[in-house]
Amino acid sequence: MSTPTPLSYKDAGVDIDAGNALVSNIKAAVKRTRRPEVMGNLGGFGALCELPTKYKQPVLVSGTDGVGTKLRLAIDYKKHDTVGIDLVAMCVNDLIVQGAEPLFFLDYYATGKLDVETATSVVNGIGEGCFQSGCALIGGETAEMPGMYEGEDYDLAGFCVGVVEKADIIDGSKVAAGDALIALASSGPHSNGYSLVRKVLEVSQADPQQDLNGKPLIQHLLEPTKIYVKSLLKLIEASDVHAMAHITGGGFWENIPRVLPENCKAVIQGDSWQWPAVFNWLMENGNIAEYEMYRTFNCGVGMIVALPADKVDAALALLAAEGEQAWLIGAIAAREGNEEQVEIL
């Protein structure tokens, strides 16, 4: 009987050395996001973070999200450096809705076979997203799971914790008829609706490299999600924000009602903005009904803010100074009976 060949973890498809190389590669990206509250360095069993001392009654706000099937397009077109920004954006934009300042972020990267170059690109993007939002990247998990994912395909999940003063939590309770609604422009479809995007590409047999408004269609589709944290923190400090809605999965119809009292509805002026070209392309090439567009995509609006009507001019000026494209998109009205909570005129 011959002696069996000794087996290693690498023989089973898990390369510990590759994982160590990744950790070494991302140290600079992590260091760039460090906040003064962070204790310790990357690599501990748990990451430590103090609460900022400026808060009297700090309330922690948590969120988790992914990038969805936008990843499929990114993998197919080898565009790995911006999906990390998407991942952070989907989490921190949810936190800012409550008025919370993001504190720290953790990521989960799962793959069948770890490609160090690809993973480094992804995590560097996560670091960029954290930098844009003032959030510390304090840890994560890289899971190499042969047999669970095909080849070098990967999936991402993000986890974020923020903090808000208890008295300053934004929960929509101050929203009232007569409030104005301000829209903040999106950078594209962000990270929602990509199963429909991919279906439109399939049925239309369109060339993703075709020109659309001066750049390839695929570039429009893979544009990273806009992060609104820093500009909205300044708006919250300077104005009287009653509510904010992050326009993600479910579009206008489902996200705006999440922050409205039962006796209020949002009346949106559909002619107050022009849809970016990518949404018109999707609608036309997929023969998608307008209602379905507003249900699936942000249609050019990444965030909606409710505030008193007399605060609009100052708010728009502040947002413009922060580099945001913002405009008056509608108003809050009294809701009667079982009326829908969102009306687009």
UniProtKB/Swiss-Prot annotation:
One of its GO terms (cellular component) is cytosol. CDD domains: PurM. Pathway: Purine metabolism; IMP biosynthesis via de novo pathway; 5-amino-1-(5-phospho-D-ribosyl)imidazole from N(2)-formyl-N(1)-(5-phospho-D-ribosyl)glycinamide: step 2/2. HAMAP family: AIRS. Disulfide bonds: none annotated. GO terms for biological process: 'de novo' IMP biosynthetic process; adenine biosynthetic process. Keywords: ATP-binding, Cytoplasm, Ligase, Nucleotide-binding, Purine biosynthesis. It is found in: Cytoplasm. The keyword Ribosomal protein does not apply. Its EC number is 6.3.3.1. This is Phosphoribosylformylglycinamidine cyclo-ligase. It catalyses: 2-formamido-N(1)-(5-O-phospho-beta-D-ribosyl)acetamidine + ATP = 5-amino-1-(5-phospho-beta-D-ribosyl)imidazole + ADP + phosphate + H(+). Belongs to the AIR synthase family. It comes from Shewanella sp. (strain ANA-3). InterPro entries: PurM-like_C_dom, PurM-like_C_sf, PurM-like_N, PurM-like_N_sf, PurM_cligase. GO terms for molecular function: ATP binding; phosphoribosylamine-glycine ligase activity; phosphoribosylformylglycinamidine cyclo-ligase activity. The keyword Signal does not apply.
